Amino acid sequence: MKPRILVLGDVMIDHYLFGKCDRISPEAPVQVVDVQKEELVLGGAGNVVNNLLAFGAEVGIISVVGEDANGIWLEQRFQEKGVQTYLLKENRPTTKKSRIIASNQQIVRVDREEKKEIESLTQQKILNVFDRVIKEYDLVLLSDYDKGVLTKEVTQTVIQRSSVPVFVDPKNDFEKYRGATLIKPNKKEASKAVGFLIKNEEDLKRAGWKLKKELDLQSLIVTLSEEGMAIFEEEMMRIPTVAKEVYDVTGAGDTVLAALGYAVAKGKNLKEAAVFANLAAGVVVGKVGAATATLEEIEEYERSIRKAPTEEFIKDFEEIELISKDLHKRGKRIVFTNGCFDILHLGHVKYLQKAKELGDVLIVGVNSDASVKRLKGDDRPINPQFDRAYLLASLEAVDYVVIFEEDTPYELIKIVKPDILVKGGDYKGKEVVGSDIAKEVRLIDFVEGKSTTAIVERMRSC
């Protein structure tokens, strides 16, 4: 069954003039663009609608337009696309943003708009429509471009009256989003809301928890451009970016909001929804203009970025020292774990996936063959060290693998200086090697019944 999603917010027209630019005007020192193509598309909250339609959702839109030709165009366009359309009219210009683009580069943007709040009577009409139709929808998306539709009165009333989750793409006054299910500011917006600049991981944590608590939010997602996203629920979780090429970030925030709403309405949890949204954004920033991504494009994109097994991710001590220094310099959170990983199994994979979720980069130390033999006996390892390292390096969760000769990874940990040191749940109450170096030690429970020793014993009994 298709999810049914209601969008409220500022609709506008995105107007594109595509052309060629290879000369300077004789009238003034400015570029001349020879227009070759012109497009009008749904923008603002309308672009959120476009993205939802591309995913396959059933969509409704509540907004305000002017009593002008652009308002008529928007209404007709929504209706042509099969959108349940509730557009109220006021004596104000319909927002239109014109972008002139040459050689895939935006030269200039011209805005025609009115930013003042909509009239009190119009606000009441919006709420009347909302009360009448909300029972038909699974989720509400508020797309705020600060053009006057989502006033504090409208926003707060919608949040309080909604019987379904309300997700918000915020702008400026965050207080009006109090009590929302989720808001998704970018780093700049979040910094402005908390009153301090987010410069590193600690700033990000402080800002995220502050916003979540003070605004009484169920969840919060801070989008971090090329650094991915940070999810704040019961714990903070990082989702790395997946964009390969960035041509135009126009509308990427709309895509993320739409993708989050669509995935949650389809029954996904927030982490799964964020991964889906990240992939969708990776598709659209590779296009020009306020683009959309279909489910087929997202699936194809996901396949294209899957990590291929390669020895390039297997490093020696010297290489990992340089890499670690660079990662620390860039403020990345390094997670480190280690083990023999003799026969890679489900328990290992799930353990490593959970470890990766704790930071930005996962480095895995692997015992050498000689080290395994000393620890496990003369009949081990089953698989030689390079094979074990290669298999680990092929996992999506693992960023780097280092083989160490010692019985413990202490010397390697001294080089890496991880932010988080991860060991299995069986280390509860035991001293963890390297705990004096890492900033934090985390224990992750293994999958019950999954162990290399058990597999080896079953093999021997055959």
From Swiss-Prot:
Ranges where the record places region Cytidylyltransferase: 336-462
SUPFAM superfamilies named in the record: Nucleotidylyl transferase, Ribokinase-like
InterPro entries assigned: Bifunc_HldE, Cyt_trans-like, PfkB_dom, RfaE_dom_I, RfaE_dom_II, Ribokinase-like, Rossmann-like_a/b/a_fold
Q: Where is the active site?
A: D254
Keyword match Nucleotidyltransferase: yes
Q: Which GO terms describe its cellular component?
A: cytosol
Could you list this entry's UniProt keywords, alphabetically sorted: ATP-binding, Carbohydrate metabolism, Kinase, Multifunctional enzyme, Nucleotide-binding, Nucleotidyltransferase, Transferase
Q: In which pathway does it act?
A: Nucleotide-sugar biosynthesis; ADP-L-glycero-beta-D-manno-heptose biosynthesis; ADP-L-glycero-beta-D-manno-heptose from D-glycero-beta-D-manno-heptose 7-phosphate: step 1/4; Nucleotide-sugar biosynthesis; ADP-L-glycero-beta-D-manno-heptose biosynthesis; ADP-L-glycero-beta-D-manno-heptose from D-glycero-beta-D-manno-heptose 7-phosphate: step 3/4
Biological process GO annotation list?
ADP-L-glycero-beta-D-manno-heptose biosynthetic process
Q: Which domain of life is it from?
A: Bacteria
Give a GO molecular function annotation for the protein: phosphotransferase activity, alcohol group as acceptor
Reaction(s) catalysed by this chain's protein: D-glycero-beta-D-manno-heptose 7-phosphate + ATP = D-glycero-beta-D-manno-heptose 1,7-bisphosphate + ADP + H(+); D-glycero-beta-D-manno-heptose 1-phosphate + ATP + H(+) = ADP-D-glycero-beta-D-manno-heptose + diphosphate
* Sequence segments annotated as region (Ribokinase): 1-309
EC number(s) given by UniProt: 2.7.1.167, 2.7.7.70
What positions does the entry give for ATP binding?
N186, K187, K188, E189
Please state what class of enzyme this protein is.
transferase
Quaternary structure note: Homodimer.
Annotated NCBIfam families:
cyt_tran_rel, rfaE_dom_I, rfaE_dom_II
| Role | Catalyzes the ADP transfer from ATP to D-glycero-beta-D-manno-heptose 1-phosphate, yielding ADP-D-glycero-beta-D-manno-heptose.
Family per record: In the N-terminal section; belongs to the carbohydrate kinase PfkB family. In the C-terminal section; belongs to the cytidylyltransferase family.
Question: Can you say what this protein is called?
Answer: Bifunctional protein HldE
Task: Name its species.
Answer: Nitratiruptor sp. (strain SB155-2)
- Per the record, the gene is hldE
